[in-house]
Amino acid sequence: LEVFTDIDIPKEYFEDILKRQAVVNAGVTFTFRNEEDGKFTKTDYCYPNGILDYVNEIAGEQTLTMPQFWQAERKGRDREDKPEYKVRISAALCFSNRVSRLEYYHNSSWLEHGGAPEKAVKNAFVYAIDAYCKQAGKYTKGESKLTFQDVADCLVLVTNCFSTQTSYENQTKKAITNKFVQDAMTEFFRDRLHVYFIENKQEADRIADQVLVNKRSRESAEKARLNIKKKLTGSLDIANRVQKFVDCRTKDVSKREIYIVEGDSALGSVKLSRDAEFQGIMPVRGKILNCLKADY
């Protein structure tokens, strides 16, 4: 207590830890008892089907595809001089246009920063969905390849892996770096997605269509952002002046004048008769509203 003077840990921290442990340890009940104002409250966390129940909870009922549960075991090594070990891979996933979530667990620990499983998922999902879009003719002519962000925006995925050898990125243990785990998971997801798309063509079409909607909306938003940024930060020149505005030559603001005229026809007449040294002109569209006949 002399060193750690603040021991008031919020209950939400314990609730989050216990819930995550219940997710990755199917059928095991974790109980949280908390005393407040002399009274105990009790909360149980249990997912009989583990990560599959968790994905159902996150995605809800309105999903693009039915939740899937895939699992496999692989055996290999990270390098030739390293010992061989086993890895058990489990994954639950579905696609949704309402919610997205990606969570990776290894040996019952939440990998907040992902590492090898995250890299495997990115590689496999982009490869499989891009291949399906090309095969099904989903891309327009000359369209760029989709990115993982386009996939992630409609993907609910939870992976839960166990291995007898684990290499963590650092002491925080929030990411793993096992090359074999990454390669095994990449192959696992590529194969499962390939088979899934063949056996479930309607769902594959819905997935591809939603991913392409995400991609095209992202590209449109990025294009609009860059155009606005260019207009706001670019220097004033002939290319980005206000349309139809006729400027004057002097930079002395005390002498500059602006004439607002009605329509392009008036613009032509005033432009011929003005003093271009200090008089600018801005035409506006005329007769937009007849105020005498307006109903307000």
Regions found by a protein language model. Give the residues of each.
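GHKL-family ATPase ATP-binding module
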Residues: 1-296
